[in-house]
Amino acid sequence: MGSFIYKQLLTNSYTVELSDEIDAIGSEKTQNVTINPGPFAQTGYAPVEWGAGETNDSTTIEPVLDGPYQPTRFNPEIGYWILLAPETQGIVLETTNTTNKWFATILIEQDVVAESRTYTIFGKTESIQAENTSQTEWKFIDIIKTTQDGTYSQYGPLVLSTKLYGVMKYGGRLYAYIGHTPNATPGHYTIANYDTMEMSIFCEFYIMPRSQEAQCTEYINSGLPPIQNTRNIVPLSLSSRSIKYQKAQVNEDIIISKTSLWKEMQYNIDIIIRFKFNNSIIKSGGLGYKWLEIAFKPANYQYNYIRDGENITAHTTCSVNGVNEFSYNGGSLPTDFAISRYEVIKENSYVYVDYWDDSQAFRNMVYVRSLAANLNTVICNGGDYSFQVPVGQWPVMSGGAVSLQSAGVTLSTQFTDFVSLNSLRFRFSLAVESPPFSITRTRVSNLYGLPAANPNGGRDFYEILGRFSLISLVPSNDDYQTPIMNSVTVRQDLDRQLGELRDEFNALSQQIAMSQLIDLALLPLDMFSMFSGIKGSIDVARSMATKVMKKFRNSKLASSVSTLTDSLSDAASSLSRTSTIRSIGSSASAWTNISSQVDDVISSTSEISTQTSTISRRLRVKEIATQTEGMNFDDISAAVLKAKIDRSTQIDSNTLPDIVTEASEKFIPNRAYRVMDGDEVLEASTDGKFFAYKVETFDEVPFDVQKFADLVTDSPVISAIIDFKTLKNLNDNYGITKAQAFNLLRSDPRVLREFINQENPIIRNRIEQLILQCKL
């Protein structure tokens, strides 16, 4: 829309596309989201890219289907199915107890007429009768002899299309599948000394625990899962199941590498983590039956323990994240028991424990890699909390439990009252446990989780045993310490100062009367327009943000807002677009003639409010005198205004930050502009919405783009403080005169204050929405 409008203009000087400027400013905006886990649990460092990241849980989960493995000879463990998956016919399995049982399994392909075949079994050539009458299915047969030189007898068979065969040693027997799919089931052979029998397997195979026998039967009858049928699965050697053990000391400090100034140290350390929860219980006023809040709070805990004969002093900070909020309301009477909000941690929550001790590992915990930890699980049980109401039996909240499982470890920084500590943050995920919690004498019962009422359950602390390891880059001289503490403290102090400034600014906005807030909302709207094309001024304002908030609170600007906006309105109404303006050919001369109309204001520039009025009048001239022959209001702001301000003796570099704060691009970012043609108004916003309507009835009419473009070049352009929807709502519910409508369309601050003083909810709500954007 913006580019189409300006294409209609005669542009023989510097031009700026409004839509491009809006997009550019919008792309530079950032939104800060603050996560506050507690004043003593701020994370100062994120995990480095070359760190270990998440640590795996130490629990070993036995797979359902382990394999495939390459053909081999081994003694299978008792109670495990060996699932054979041969590709071709022939001998697939041999096993013997070397005394009275020689056992082998043969696979016969489809459609085989009875014939004698020669196989090599246990190193000897044997003739075995082979037959398979099925046209589509394969056949496994078991052959057994009882003496080394005896003859084989056939048993089984197993007929199926999946070409799978299962065998297992268990309970003094050798189990093997027999029958016909889909009803194949395990059969068995009694064999002495079965536990010492080794098996020679001549095809790929899998291993399954006996507990998964039902799944094994399903595979025999229906086939392996699809992932096992791909040719990308490569069988491994059975030796890959072996575990290589390495002996290591419990606590180690190992030098990995060393240069002249730095060395890498690997620390393998056992730790004892003790922590406790803290809470805040706030009772409401009144008769004593209402509770306002029961919430978790960060808790510090310091303790000592012995590690390898050394007395260790440790410090932990426990905080929670992702709490669940509950409430209970027993009724509307003042004597009805009620809790407005109480917090519960459940399976969607996390517990953070920041750990530090006085050992060598934590002295230089700055440049760290290969960070890993293994911790035990702990169960946290809630205790009882009695709500002491004035009369009657006390309701009691009791029960609740969660288990904490280690979910990772990162670096962090703890800020105590005296020092900042580089520490480790252990993150724990939660699972709900029994018993559930309830509140006696209420409907609250059988809810799972750990409530904040008594999360420690009368214990002094919870304890977790574990071990962590890391590699740290430290100075070669052990007496030196990595100089990081000061910079951390400076950053923390700066954050606190900025937070205080924001709080002061927001508190100020709440203290100013509503009428002044209206004026305050109008002022940055004009400031935004003035500086929208002057990047340098905005950069100055950004760099002076904190200075602005300090000065703004103590200056006369807040008390002079009403006078200032009155002067804005006067400047706008007194301006006449004469033929002299139209005949001007250069931007500079146009500015000179326009500025001469406000010379009466320039004489007094001692106060910030007067200087602001001077700029604002020039600004309003810029907005009203939109398009002349050869220039538009963006041309004035970009090509002329900055040069004039830079040369002005009344406006210096220290005044600009006082007027244009970092909020100059945040106040009312969704701008809307309107032009008026008689009793018809055309309105277009920066987000692409547009309206056309009659002033008297506020009935919408078709929006004529060409007419809007022509009016922009030849009519005043007004910033739309009260938008079309608000005006129409006001007219439909209260009715307004034509004069009031025109004043609202012109954003006359006097008229706006009149509506506010009359407690008009529609205008008040609109202004409050704009003011909400003024908060930092």
Swiss-Prot record:
Query: Which chain positions carry the site (Cleavage)?
Result: 231-232, 241-242, 247-248
Recorded superkingdom: Viruses
Region ranges (Spike body and stalk (antigen domain)): 248-479
Per the Swiss-Prot or TrEMBL annotation, the motif YGL motif is positioned at 448-450
The set of disulfide-linked cysteines is 203-216, 318-380
Coiled-coil positions? 491-511
For this UniProt record, the keywords arranged alphabetically read as follows:
Capsid protein, Coiled coil, Disulfide bond, Hemagglutinin, Host cell membrane, Host cytoplasm, Host cytoskeleton, Host endoplasmic reticulum, Host membrane, Host-virus interaction, Membrane, Outer capsid protein, Viral attachment to host cell, Viral penetration into host cytoplasm, Viral penetration via permeabilization of host membrane, Virion, Virus entry into host cell
Q: What is this protein called?
A: Outer capsid protein VP4
A single GO CC term for this protein reads: host cell plasma membrane
Where are the residues of the annotated region Spike foot? 510-776
Q: Which Pfam families match?
A: Rota_VP4_MID, VP4_haemagglut, VP4_helical
Species of origin reads Rotavirus A (isolate RVA/Cow/India/Hg18/2000/G15P[21])
Q: Which family does it belong to?
A: Belongs to the rotavirus VP4 family.
Give start-end ranges for motif KID motif.
644-646
Ranges for the region named Spike head are 65-224
Alphabetized Gene3D superfamilies for the sequence: 1.20.5.170, 2.60.120.200
